Regions:
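Core segments of small alpha/beta cavity-forming domains
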Residues: 254-303
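Short solvent-exposed beta->alpha transition segments
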Residues: 282-326, 339-341
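Pro/Ala/Gly-rich low-complexity, hydrophilic intrinsically disordered segments
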Residues: 101-130, 137, 238-268
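Sec-dependent N-terminal signal peptides of Gram-positive bacterial secreted proteins and lipoproteins
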Residues: 2-27
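Exported/periplasmic cell-wall-interacting domains
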Residues: 180-268, 275-276
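Short Lys/Arg-enriched alpha/beta "domain-start" segment
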Residues: 27-63
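N-terminal post-signal-peptidase region of extra-cytosolic proteins
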Residues: 59-82, 126-144, 167-194
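Exposed beta-sheet edge and beta->alpha loop/turn motif
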Residues: 136-139, 320-370
């Protein structure tokens, strides 16, 4: 009996001691698991993880933190602690505590260099290589078979390229592949653009697909026609120009969207806003907003998600806004909710503090018109 009591008190003392040692060791003596994770949203079904270095972890645990009054910048990179996304890392290598809304004061120089190298490696592993249509046409020849991975759901299916002079005309390989593709589009075929990775024996490439069967189909796969995959510099048959929505999704699939938003023109901001609201893709919308409008986005997400379709019906102005600080753009939009469809003239009020800074859209004024 004494031996049993002795063992009990010994284990209890060890557990208490471990608790005082801090969160780096669990009650079972196992070290907490920390890892990088990269994904376009916390809910994304596709993510890439990598071990988080112990020396940076110590810096995070023992470093000085400062409260922030602004929202955490849009990012695709996080630190996961025991399966929970606890911290965010922006593209300037700042680390934020997501629950406490704090920023870690600058990392030690050696840790910052390590973090930079890790971010580059993680980025390469997760996203697709940005290749031109000329390269894609060569690397993915007609009748080649490759895999398509949807960046948001993480679902993948196999396709065969059948044709296409300006972009790839492809078909799901089997009935099962068709079912997976339709699941990605929530059970309904759609012209909506989606960011994808094209996985072939020649590499991992950034692309954009739509989900509407059209034209001819030759495979016995239950898919009535083919669909299109675009790469950088691909053009549509009708316009002979690169489709802006496909271009946005290609930037998303290559991991360049967050940085690319700094260079968008007012006209591109309008189209990106419409696309993001239509597809409820807040990863696209958030980085083109400033802090004030990002807070508004969080407050009005439910209201925006009630919009089932939004489409631009009129042309954008060709006026150059390179020397301006404000730029109102009025377009005709079709807006559909469960209550019905309306066509209306809507003004996007775009502004920037200086000509060196990126454009943003006044979300509050836009919401009142939608």
């Amino acid at each position: 009996m004494k031996r049993v009591l002795y063992s009990f008190f010994t284990i209890a003392a060890i557990l208490i001691g471990l608790n005082f040692l801090g969160s780096s060791v669990s009650a079972l003596g196992q070290e907490d698991k920390w890892e990088y994770v990269i994904q376009t949203s916390i809910e994304s079904g596709y993510s890439t993880a990598m071990p988080f270095p112990k020396q940076i972890r110590k810096n995070v645990q023992n470093g000085k933190w400062e409260a922030i009054s602004y929202p955490i910048p849009p990012t695709d990179t996080f630190i996961r602690e025991n399966g929970k996304v606890a911290y965010a890392i922006d593209h300037q290598l700042n680390i934020y505590d997501r629950s406490a809304n704090k920023i870690l004061l600058p990392l030690m120089e050696k840790n910052k260099k390590q973090l930079s190298n890790d971010m580059k490696k993680l980025h390469r592993n997760h996203y697709g290589e940005l290749i031109t249509w000329n390269d894609a046409n060569r690397l993915l020849p007609r009748y080649s078979i490759f895999k398509v991975l949807d960046l948001d759901t993480g679902l993948s299916f196999e396709v065969q390229r059948r044709a296409g002079s300006y972009h790839a005309d492809v078909q799901p390989l089997t009935h099962d592949d068709t079912k997976i593709m339709k699941k990605i589009y929530r059970g309904t075929w759609s012209w909506d653009r989606r960011a994808i990775l094209v996985l072939s024996e020649n590499g991992q490439f950034a692309g954009s697909m739509h989900g509407m069967p059209h034209g001819q189909g030759a495979l016995k796969n239950g898919f009535p026609g083919h669909f299109c995959i675009h790469f950088q510099d691909s053009i549509t048959h009708k316009s002979r120009k690169m489709d802006h929505a496909h271009s946005i999704m290609i930037k998303k699939a290559s991991g360049e969207w967050l940085d690319h938003t700094q260079k968008l023109s007012p006209q591109e901001i309008v189209d990106a806003t419409v696309l993001a609201i239509h597809q409820h893709d807040w990863f696209i919308l958030s980085p083109i907003l400033d802090d004030r409008n990002r807070i508004l986005l969080e407050k009005h997400l439910e209201e925006l998600e009630e919009i089932e379709l939004i489409k631009r019906l009129s042309d954008l102005p060709r006026e150059d806004g390179s020397t301006k600080l404000t730029f109102p753009i009025t377009v005709k939009l079709q807006v559909h909710r469960s209550s019905g469809t309306t066509n209306r003239m809507v003004t996007f009020d775009l502004y920037r503090p200086t000509i060196e800074e990126p454009w943003t859209v006044d979300l509050e004024k836009l919401l009142k018109q939608l």
